[in-house]
A protein has these predicted regions:
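Acidic, polar-rich low-complexity tracts and alpha-helical solenoid repeat scaffolds
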Residues: 2-543, 549, 557-562, 568, ...
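Acidic, low-complexity, intrinsically disordered peripheral segments
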Residues: 409, 629, 639, 644-657
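Short, functionally critical alpha-helical segments immediately adjacent to catalytic or ligand/cofactor-binding
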Residues: 520-537, 580-584, 599-607, 643
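Short glycine- and hydrophobic/aromatic-rich loop-to-beta-strand nucleating segment
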Residues: 549-551, 580
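A short, structured beta-strand-centered segment in the mid-to-C-terminal lobe
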Residues: 568-578
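Catalytic and binding regions of secreted/periplasmic enzymes and modules that target cell-wall glycans
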Residues: 589-618
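Short, flexible loop segments at boundaries between secondary-structure elements
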Residues: 636
Length: 657
């Protein structure tokens, strides 16, 4: 081999090695460097330094699990910079190179959105692929809308608009409204649909009217309802008339609908109509009787239950008996059975109480009243000195309904405690990511570690993870609501050490509670605050109660003046520390006036101290449990149970061992 050939070969080898090295470096990247690049890019994005953010995200290695998320961020940077070509390029790279990634569907959808006007044929192709391959996603629902828009735009200015194409446009809008009646494109779907020069069915007008109502456009709803069939639309017409303050029409429609058209609507719709009627009532007992007399069997169990609830004590039991016999398998039939069960307990007819209670648990083991029935079967067994039986019922209540108010009462009974509060305190723990067993290699863990919460929200369907994201973003009330609803769906409930519980029962403002609770139980005050405001310092009720502990301004002003707390305006109640200080002082006054009885004080915090005094004088009870069950004001009875349920759960989750 001569010298020139050797030199050429050497140059080629060096070039190859250099190129391979560059290629290797672009694919392989140390984890530490990847995280640093992503973190810095995210920081620049939040600081609106989009050019630099785009560049840093582009440097994330191709082999990194974070690469598709970096590409998506690049597209968002390009969007902020007004660079449509780069935005489209990144979306296409994402859904072509990372087809298995959840973001690929979103990327294709966003690309389709961008092309609706510029390249409708390509946009339609993208939307069609989404509908076909991912039919159960929100992106598929929105793609239906855009498919209709693209077809409409193609033909609306042509001399011939075939009826078959109009049918396709109509079908696209119909599917969208059926699946997303409150979707972001819903009102546009209606307005575009109405431009089609074709006959629209009564059912479709009802579909449009329902969406308009959900968007609180009551006049438009009224206009659309005029084209519907009353037998199908009477409930919506009732609700819309109520919203328009047309009380006479709303009442007339309820009566007419209950008499003639209940078979055409769902039971829950009948309940809504009845509730509107009762909201307009000046004589609830009379109006319940009117509705009861005219209603057909469907949905009558709800009206019957209202009739029983409003009946005098001497007629109530017979009313519940008839309700249960006529609707033995319905929700309200089950509630009637539970009321009959407790009536036997009040009358000390334990033999029949046990029979009814056992029948209830056999038929409705997961019914709303199952924890109450199970607990009271334990109380009856204890009163009958049946040790093994009452121990079994109390333990079952705790095991099957661990986070329920009756689990708390069962624990008190098991331990033979004479007090309402437990001799225990909590050790505050922070809200954490809700799953312990997540791998550090999991991309979800990496995104959480990088605090890329918006990206996490896009890539997860887990409600607890979403709750955690909202908490990290400072949306505490929203976080709790999402976690609470998610936990209600879990059967059985997870162990008390499960991190998901901390999202349902987070600890906020506890230092301030400790500082100002005085002789009040700090855990109980935490529970009260949770139920009053979900830790929203700016909460304001319809009657004017304000802040974390939902204090009425006049009451708060009186307490502040009495103790010299320095409240100068009602808006001061939105200041967390002052609200907690005044709220604890107020609760302490209630507690002192009610012989240090916390259940009575909690009832008074909601229903008023005068009401509690009257109830104690008028209700026959032998212990705390009988008193709570017989609080005549349903809101207060439920409030007491909610607060002590929260109290119990805070102790379960955070108890200081």
């Amino acid at each position: 081999m001569n010298k020139k050939i050797k030199i050429a070969v050497g140059v080629l080898l060096v070039s190859f090695c250099f190129g391979a090295g560059v290629l290797f470096a672009s694919f392989y990247q140390p984890e530490e460097k990847t995280l640093q690049l992503y973190s810095n890019a995210l920081k620049d994005f939040k600081n609106e330094e989009y050019q630099n953010s785009y560049y840093l995200f582009s440097k994330v290695g191709f082999l990194s699990k974070l690469k598709p998320y970096a590409i998506y961020h690049q597209a968002q940077c390009a969007k902020e910079l007004g660079d449509k070509a780069s935005e489209m390029k990144q979306y296409q790279l994402l859904f072509n190179a990372y087809r298995q990634n959840d973001l690929s569907i979103r990327a294709k959808y966003l690309a389709g959105q961008m092309l609706v006007d510029e390249n409708p044929e390509q946009a339609a192709k993208y939307f069609k692929e989404i509908i076909k391959k991912h039919p159960s996603t929100d992106y598929a629902i929105a793609s239906e809308y855009y498919s209709g828009i693209i077809l409409l735009n193609e033909y609306k200015n042509k001399s011939v608009f075939p009826l078959s194409v109009k049918d396709d446009v109509e079908m696209a809008f119909r599917h969208y409204l059926e699946k997303a009646p409150q979707g972001r494109h819903a009102l546009n779907a209606i307005s575009n649909w109405l431009t089609l020069s074709k006959e629209i069915s009564k059912d479709d007008y009802l579909l449009m009217a329902n969406t308009s109502f959900l968007f609180e456009d009551y006049e438009k709803t009224k206009e659309l309802l005029a084209y519907t069939d009353l037998k199908d639309s009477w409930v919506l017409d009732v609700k819309n008339s109520y919203a328009l303050k047309n009380s006479s029409r709303a009442r007339q429609l309820v009566q007419y609908g209950l008499k003639n058209y209940t078979q055409y609507v769902e039971e829950k719709d009948i309940y809504d109509a009845v509730n509107v009627y009762m909201n307009l009532s000046n004589s609830k007992k009379y109006d319940i009787d009117v509705l009861y007399d005219i209603s057909s069997p469907k949905g009558k169990d709800y009206i019957w239950s209202l009739k029983c609830d409003a009946a005098s004590a001497e007629y109530q039991v017979e009313c519940y008996k008839k309700l249960y016999l006529n609707y033995p398998n319905s929700l309200y039939g089950a509630n009637a059975m539970a009321n009959l069960f407790f009536d036997r307990i009040k009358k000390r007819d334990y033999k029949n109480a046990v029979k009814i209670g056992k029948d209830y648990l056999n038929k409705f083991s997961s019914g709303n009243s199952a924890p109450m029935v199970m607990f009271w079967l334990g109380k009856v067994a204890e009163r009958n000195n049946n040790y093994e039986e009452y121990m079994e019922y109390y333990k079952r209540t705790i095991a099957e309904f661990p986070d329920n108010y009756y689990a708390y009462r069962a624990y008190i009974a098991l331990k033979h405690l004479k007090t309402t509060l437990l001799n225990a305190s909590i050790k505050p723990q922070p809200v954490e990511y809700p799953y312990k067993n997540i791998s550090k290699e999991d991309v979800i863990f990496k995104l959480a570690q990088l605090q890329d919460y918006n990206m996490l929200e896009l890539t997860t369907d887990d409600e607890f993870v979403k709750s955690w994201i909202y908490y990290q973003k400072g949306e505490y009330s929203h976080s709790m609501l999402v976690a609470r609803d998610a936990m209600e769906k879990l059967t059985p409930r997870p162990e008390r050490s499960d991190l998901r519980w901390r999202l349902v029962y987070p600890i906020d403002y506890y230092d301030e509670i400790l500082q100002y609770s005085g002789e009040n139980d700090s855990t109980l005050m935490l529970a009260l605050m949770r139920e009053e405001s979900y830790f929203n310092p700016n909460a304001q009720s319809s009657v004017g109660a304000r802040g974390l502990m939902q204090l009425m301004p006049a009451t708060a002003q009186e307490i502040s003046s009495q103790y010299g707390f320095g409240m100068t305006s009602y808006d001061d109640l939105f200041k967390p520390e002052l609200n907690i200080k005044i709220g604890n002082a107020y609760y302490s006054q209630l507690r002192n006036a009610l012989d240090q009885l916390d259940i009575s004080a909690i009832a008074a915090y909601n229903g008023g101290i005068g009401s509690v005094g009257r109830w104690k004088n008028n209700v026959k009870y032998s212990d705390t449990d009988e008193f709570v069950e017989q609080i005549p004001y349903m809101e207060t009875k439920n409030y007491v149970k909610k607060v002590f349920r929260s109290y119990w759960n805070y102790l379960r989750i955070y108890i200081k061992e």
